Structures are given as structure tokens and as C-alpha cells.
């Protein structure tokens, strides 16, 4: 069952996104130290959807405009692989069915091959490269922009 996280779930969200096997992959050099992690401001926004389709799996949708959201996902080690892929597909379908969302995009730094693979597995297609746009450990990386439209997802079901 799909759970939309609220400010009451901040500790749970922080425990997942702050996990040692996740935090280094979902942050850049401007991220706060782990001790200061707090997602309450995001969880309080009506237009931001922090979804937990399966235990240990988070999918965060942030609006770009009235019909397009940017997505990022994270899963605890025991929820990776097929579980995360199914959770991401469920969250994507939920967004298209329950919000005005018509398109979902993501930006994947070139060093994150697992995130790139997940995006492609759920039907997202590469749409371009945002060159030299992600700073991690003092190194600047390109990001691949991927996207999927509501109609494309419906055709795959």
C-alpha cells in the first residue's frame, strides 16, 4: 500500500536517506552533515510527494512546474533490486493517477550507474546531458536527464 510521508515521518525518512549506504549517493558537496539531516521542510510542502510504496523504499517527487515533477529514489540494502524497481514503478503510476503530473524527470550523476539503471528499468528514457553540473568530493560530473510521460507509462502497462 502506498504511504505518503508527512512531517510526522521525518525520523523514518531521515533514517532511510541518512543510511550510510544511501547518503553518500544522494548528496553533493553542498549537503549538510548527516547530524543536521532534517526533511521536515520538504515533508510540509503540499506539492512535494515523499512516497513509500514498500518498506525501506522512498520515492521523492518535487515539482518543476504544474505538470512536471523531478523524482529521486532510495532503498535500504534489504529492499534493493526487484523490490525497489517494483516500488519505483508503483510510485510513478501513483503520481500519474493521483496528481496533475504528466511527466516525471530525473537527473543522474555520471558516477551513479545503479540510479541510471533503475531509471531505465522503470521506462525512463535519456533526454539529454547537463554537463559539469554535479559536484561530489571536489569532482565535477555530468548528469544524464531522463524522463517519462504519463502516456508512455500507460502504453507499457
Predicted regions and their residues:
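Acyl-donor (CoA/ACP) binding surface of acyl/acetyltransferases
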Residues: 1-26, 45-157
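Active-site rim helix/loop that mediates acceptor-substrate recognition in acyltransferases
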Residues: 27-48
